[in-house]
Structures are given as C-alpha cells and as structure tokens.
C-alpha cells in the first residue's frame, strides 16, 4: 500500500544522527519524513548520560554553529557542566555536560514535533526501494510504501543487533527494543562491504543502595559553561555532583576468575569493540599492571535514582556483575536496576561513501551514525546533520557540500571515514586534526555559520546574533589597535604591576595583550582600555585572535599550500590501469576507492606523493586540469 503523500527526504531512525538529519532537511525547506520504530525513544541516550568531551565537544559546537539541535538540547538538560583541559591552550579545551536523560529526550521530541516541513511516523522499516541504482523510497513493517528522492539511514545498533549477557544472547537493537533483521538482510543484498562491530554498556545502579559518604564528590564548574552559541545559563536545570570510586584487586580477581564466561573471551562475539571505551574485563586484561581503575558515578537525572557507573561496561553474566559492583567502595550493598550488556551489530564500510555521506553505489541513499562504524552521540549528530543537509541538496538537484579537514572536525570525520575506513568503532579526538589550532570550540560559528546560512540551515535569530558578535569583535580590535600607552602615560604605574617587566616603550592595547602574562580581563581594568566588552564570546575571540595571531597565520599559510590540488576532480569513469607509471598496488587501491578528488586520493593509505604527481600529469595531458591547477 502506497502512503498518500510523497516526500523529498526520508530519514530512518530517530537517534542522535536521525534527529539532526531530519531537522537539517526540514530546515532547508524539504518535505521530510522521520520514521522510527518508537516515537517515545526519539533522542534517547542509549548509553552514557553525557554530551561532549575532548574532540566530541568540538563536534557539538560545530553542529550548533550550523543550526543543529544537540547543544541547545544539552543546555536545557545538563545537570553538570565542566570545561576539560581548562588550563591548556584554547585548541584542546572542551565542554562536557552530564544530562538528565528525560529532560534531554523531552526537549528533542518537542523540537521535532514543532518543526515545519517535518512529519513523524511510527513504523519500523523492513526494505528500501531501489530502481536502476537509484533510491525510490522505503517499505515499512506493515507493508506501507513511502516514496522520496533521498533516503537517510541512521539505524544505530539495530541492524542484525544481538545482545550478549554472559554466554546467553538474544536478538535486540538495544535493551528493550527489537532489532532490525529484515532491513539488515535487505542491505546485505546491495553492493556494500559489511562487517560487525560491538559496543557495551555498564549495569545501572539504584542510588538508594549506595553509600555516598565514602565517595569523592566531583562538582561542575561555577559559573557553568554554556554549550550553544544561542544558549544561556538560565536555561540550565539544577546542578548536581558526580562521584568517584575505584575498582580494586578484589574486583579484578572476580573478573579474571570468570573470563571463561565472557562472550568476548569465549569467542562468541566477533565484532571489535571501541578502543577508547573498553569493557572492564578488557581493561583488567590489557592493563594487568594496574591494581585499580577510576570509576565515575554519573546520575541519570534529577527525578530518577538510577546511576551510570562510567568505566565498568561489561558483558559478563549477571551474577558476576553483582560481584563486580559490590566489590567497589560505597557499593557493598548496591542494587543493580538494569544489567550491563554488549551489543553486536552490522556496520557498512564507510569507504563506500562519498564525502557527502551519499553511498557510491546507490544514488540518493545516505548513511549516518553507527552504521558508518563510529561510536558516540556527538559523532552521530555531526554525521546526521551533514547527511540530512546533503540529502536535501540532492533532492533539489543541487551539488552536495561537506567541510574540508581544515574547516571543521566534521570535515576530519568524513574524510577519515571515507578515505581510510575503520576496523573498530571510530571516536573523534583533537589529535586527529592537523589544523586543530584553527578548529577550536570557541570559533565554530566563525568557521561555519556563514556557510550554514548560505545553505539554508541558520534561522534569522542565530544569524542576527552571529553578525552582532562579528561587529563587536571588529570594533573592539580596532579600539585596542588605536589606543596607546607609553612610559609617561597616566596609569602606567598600575599597568606595570601587571607586567613581568615594566613598560619601556609605547605600545597599543593589542601589543600589551600579546604579552603572556596579560589577559583581556586584566587589560580592561586599566582606565585607558576600559570598559570591557559586555559580549563575553566576542571578548574571548579578541583575546585568542590577538595572542595566537602568528601561529594562526602560519597554519593558514600551510593550508593554502596544501589546498592547491585539494579539489582537483578525478573523473568517476577513470580507469587507473590506463595511467602510465602507476604501480599495480596504487592502481588497485585507486580503482577500489574511486576517489572524487586529488586531495582525497592523496590520503588513501599507500598512495605516494609520486603517484599523485603522475595523476596530475595525466590530467594535464588529457586537458582535465583547470586554470591555476598546473601539475
């Protein structure tokens, strides 16, 4: 049976990738349908109740800068906010917030239900409609057909999902939800490379059964950092602490004694787990020299007693989980509310994706989130936003867009995935970006909001706020450049108390701000440079831009050099066997990857600078180089 309405974009799955994808497509004016197996789980935090962290917070800020939802949702649901790496340079500072799961989910659903151009419908999808390598729509569990020009699959861990607790296992998409078996079988019929990954989650604990008096409390920052560029502290709910406990030798003995009952160590789980979020049994075996591991006790919300013990993700049997939990200080009488488990699921090799998240083999079909081999809410949200945007552009017969590596962590993410692929769940870190001094949390809007406005993602309120900030920054920098002091100026005594060496020659406000010991806050206490900007974000940008000017300029020069051939197109039909001088290995890799540009080709493992030079000569010889792209 065909549904009575056609759509431009269909999004399958209502997690962190799906919600951002649906909102992006709808914001750009396309009739969008979001299909989910259960409307009550839209925006659900399936694992840890937190958003952000090193690399991840950067992605959240970028999603926000492009009009996305995640940062605003956590600003309305965050019950503890912290700035990580606060004592380090601005490039690696990152925001992280604990979330009230219920508040987060409610905020997401409210936005979805009130977004123009967006229709929600509760039905699992069992099939995709493909004709002549083009997507035409989807078929739901009850045989209902929906037609659209573009389809975005954001199916999380549901494809062929299998839940493991000890040596027992059963089909499931996550605890309490059915897997997507029919769709998994259907997708395996399509010409994609598919494999298995696994992830896990710890048992949840009843706070009423924990002795907090013996635990170390960990409080958030005061004043609390704000995630969204449109956010305010007044949006934050009541703030509460987290707690810290540790595993001990007794814990480790319990784990070692029961390894034969672990599905991972018994060889039942084939999928590879996340390297940077290992299970407790993995930690004990991999770091055998450690007699203790720190465990963060994270509240799941203001109106629940459930606790999330971050650091003891496990798939060991339930009786062993009880022993592990009760071996830790403060948890001697702990009651487990939900058992921990591992989940194994299908993912598709992201090297089969274009940089727009469109699949190379089925036109109009886009993948985002864990289906691409990533882990984490933030990575999912970033992919969802870009896939939704590009599905919208595709449905309008417009050229797709994705940021470069030097423009955004979102650019690093898709470039890493589509050129190198992944064998384990991929997590974002600041260390993955070559140009991280330019890719800071604080300047995500300066990097992306203007482009997002051009693409139709940014509303008038955000655009007005952005332009006000730009204006404030420009005026303040001009003021500091034009305001001078010399050793004889009024107020120089006060200035000298702030400097390591007394002032010996005339200097502008910007000259003084470049000094390591000087901050914008200190500088504007001096009468000559008062008053400070009321716009705290603009003030922060002024300080960073002035202090790091030389380093920033150096990175921009490097980028300009590397960009010379970044976007030089490689014809899709090019047979690399016909390119004289390429080794057999290079030919095989290029024919398998079919890179869209010289830049992408250069980042494929095993493709040498010499091979790139040969390609450029070939393109020039056949008149395929544009003016200014000389080989």
Swiss-Prot record:
NAD(+) binds at residues 273-287. FAD binds at residues 13-18, 125, 180, 370. PROSITE patterns: GIDA_1 (PS01280), GIDA_2 (PS01281). GO terms for molecular function: flavin adenine dinucleotide binding. The keyword Transport does not apply. GO terms for cellular component: cytosol. Keywords: Cytoplasm, FAD, Flavoprotein, NAD, tRNA processing. Its cofactor is FAD. GO terms for biological process: tRNA methylation; tRNA wobble uridine modification. It is found in: Cytoplasm. It holds the Pfam family SAM_GIDA_C. Homodimer. Heterotetramer of two MnmE and two MnmG subunits. Belongs to the MnmG family. NAD-binding protein involved in the addition of a carboxymethylaminomethyl (cmnm) group at the wobble position (U34) of certain tRNAs, forming tRNA-cmnm(5)s(2)U34. This is tRNA uridine 5-carboxymethylaminomethyl modification enzyme MnmG. It comes from Vibrio cholerae serotype O1 (strain ATCC 39315 / El Tor Inaba N16961). The gene is mnmG.
């Amino acid at each position: 049976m065909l549904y009575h309405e056609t759509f431009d974009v269909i999004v399958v799955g209502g997690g962190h990738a799906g919600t951002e994808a649906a909102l992006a497509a709808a914001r750009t004016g396309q009739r969008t349908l979001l299909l989910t197996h259960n409307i009550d789980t839209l925006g659900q935090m399936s694992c840890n109740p937190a958003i952000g962290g090193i690399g991840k917070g950067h992605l959240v800020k970028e999603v926000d800068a492009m009009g996305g939802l995640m940062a605003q949702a956590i600003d309305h649901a965050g019950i503890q906010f912290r700035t990580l790496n606060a004592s380090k340079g601005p490039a690696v500072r990152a925001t992280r917030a604990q979330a009230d799961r219920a508040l987060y989910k409610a905020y997401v659903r409210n936005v979805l239900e009130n977004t123009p151009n967006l229709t929600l419908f509760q039905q699992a999808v069992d099939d995709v409609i493909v004709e002549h390598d083009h997507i035409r729509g989807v078929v739901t569990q009850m045989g209902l057909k929906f037609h659209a020009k573009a389809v975005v699959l954001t199916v999380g861990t549901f494809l062929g999902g299998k839940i493991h607790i000890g040596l027992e296992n059963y089909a499931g998409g996550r605890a309490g939800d059915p897997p997507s078996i029919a769709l998994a079988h259907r997708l395996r019929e399509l010409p994609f490379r598919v494999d298995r990954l696994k992830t896990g989650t710890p048992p949840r604990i009843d706070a009423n059964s924990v002795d907090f008096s013996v635990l170390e409390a960990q409080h958030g920052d005061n004043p609390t950092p704000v995630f969204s560029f449109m956010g305010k502290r007044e949006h934050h709910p009541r703030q509460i602490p987290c707690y810290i406990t540790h595993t001990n030798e007794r814990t480790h003995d319990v784990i070692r004694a029961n390894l034969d009952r672990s599905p991972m160590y018994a060889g039942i789980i084939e999928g590879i787990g996340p390297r940077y979020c290992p299970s407790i049994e993995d930690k004990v075996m991999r770091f055998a020299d450690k007699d203790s591991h720190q465990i963060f006790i994270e509240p799941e919300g203001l109106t629940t007693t459930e606790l999330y013990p971050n650091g003891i993700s496990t798939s060991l049997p339930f009786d062993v989980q009880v022993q592990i939990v009760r071996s830790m200080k403060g948890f001697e009488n702990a009651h487990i509310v939900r058992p921990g488990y591992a989940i194994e699921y299908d993912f598709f090799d992201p090297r089969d994706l274009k940089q727009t998240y469109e699949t190379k083999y089925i036109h109009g079909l886009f993948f985002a989130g864990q289906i691409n081999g990533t882990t984490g809410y933030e990575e999912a949200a970033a992919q969802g936003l870009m896939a939704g945007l590009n599905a919208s552009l595709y449905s309008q017969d417009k050229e797709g867009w994705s940021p470069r590596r030097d423009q955004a962590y979102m650019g690093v993410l898709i470039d890493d995935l589509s050129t190198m692929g992944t064998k384990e769940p991929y997590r974002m870190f600041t260390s993955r970006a070559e140009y991280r001094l330019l890719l800071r949390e604080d300047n995500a809007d300066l990097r992306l909001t203007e482009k997002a406005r051009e693409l139709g993602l940014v509303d008038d309120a955000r655009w007005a706020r952005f332009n006000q900030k730009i204006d404030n920054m420009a005026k303040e920098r001009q003021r500091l450049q034009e305001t001078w002091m010399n050793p004889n100026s009024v107020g120089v005594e006060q200035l000298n108390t702030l400097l390591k060496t007394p002032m010996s020659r005339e200097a502008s406000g910007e000259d003084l701000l470049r000094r390591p010991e000087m901050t914008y806050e200190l500088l504007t206490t001096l009468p000559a440079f008062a008053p400070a900007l009321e716009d705290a974000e603009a003030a922060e940008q002024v300080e960073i831009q002035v202090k790091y000017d030389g380093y920033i300029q150096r990175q921009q020069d490097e980028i300009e050099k590397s960009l010379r051939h970044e976007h030089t197109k490689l014809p899709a039909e090019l047979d690399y066997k016909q390119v004289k001088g390429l080794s057999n290995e290079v030919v095989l890799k290029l024919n398998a990857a079919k890179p869209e540009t010289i830049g992408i080709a250069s980042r494929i493992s095993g493709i040498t600078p010499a091979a790139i030079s040969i390609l450029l000569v070939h393109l020039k010889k056949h008149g395929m180089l544009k003016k200014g792209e000389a080989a």
